[in-house]
Regions:
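Short, well-structured alpha-helical segments in soluble
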Residues: 104-114
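Bacterial N-terminal signal peptides
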Residues: 9-19
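Well-ordered beta-strand positions
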Residues: 117-119
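C-terminal/domain-edge helix-coil "capping" segments
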Residues: 23-43, 63, 72, 112-113, ...
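Short, flexible beta-strand-to-coil junctions
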Residues: 48-54, 121-128
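N-terminal segment of the mature soluble domain
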Residues: 52-102
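Acidic/histidine-rich, surface-exposed loop or edge segments in extracytoplasmic proteins
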Residues: 38-52, 87-90
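Bacterial N-terminal signal peptides that target proteins for export
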Residues: 1-11
Length: 191
């Protein structure tokens, strides 16, 4: 009887853990006609990120965490710093020093020269960190792909390493979505 109760308790704990994991899975949206398989170069745009704790990374460190995470990507990733350099060479405007709204507008106007799509990361930095990764087509500036990645609930997770880990999950998931679309296109072309 004691063994049965222990077994039931373990099963219940496992079910609760599994339910918790399922509820906290990333939410992915691929828009119709996204053409993710055609994205060979993805530029990182300026993120929507604001520190809520003193020990959190600065915006520049957050951008670096995103770019460092891109090493797991199969797609060629263009850093925000490289985009700023290219735009400054082409237009004479340094998007890193002008007001953010102007910088975003100029980025959107110029990004088509260097990339097939661009990524804007938004970090909801409340009691639980949630990273929203939105990919936009350069020709229309319309969102074609979105991924919501929940993080941990503790303030200890608001650091460079945690943000990099969340961004790595984005790049892996984006690559899988692009591969799935490519396979689907190949299958449709065979038929």
């Amino acid at each position: 009887m004691k063994l049965m109760k222990m077994t039931l308790a373990i099963m219940f704990a496992f079910m609760m853990l599994a339910a918790n994991v399922v509820c906290e899975a990333a939410a992915e949206t691929v828009d119709n006609g996204a053409e993710l398989a055609r994205v060979k170069r993805l530029a990182i745009g300026y993120p929507d990120y604001y520190k809520t704790l003193e020990k959190e990374p600065t915006t520049d460190e957050f951008i670096k965490a995103i770019f460092d995470a891109s090493k797991v990507a199969r797609t060629y990733i263009i850093s925000y710093d490289d985009m700023a350099t290219h735009i400054k060479q082409d237009t004479g405007i340094d998007i890193k020093v002008i007001p953010k709204m102007d910088a975003r507008r100029i980025f959107k106007e110029q990004v088509y020269k260097y990339a097939d799509a661009y990524l804007i990361v938004t970090l909801a930095n409340n009691s639980r960190v949630t990273m929203f990764c939105d990919v936009y087509a350069v020709n229309t500036n319309e969102r074609v792909y979105s991924l919501q990645i929940p993080g941990n609930k503790s303030d200890d997770s608001k650091n460079f390493k945690s943000y990099k880990t969340l961004a790595e999950e984005f790049f892996r998931t984006f690559d899988r979505a692009a591969q799935a679309e490519a396979k689907k296109e190949a299958k449709n072309n065979k038929d």
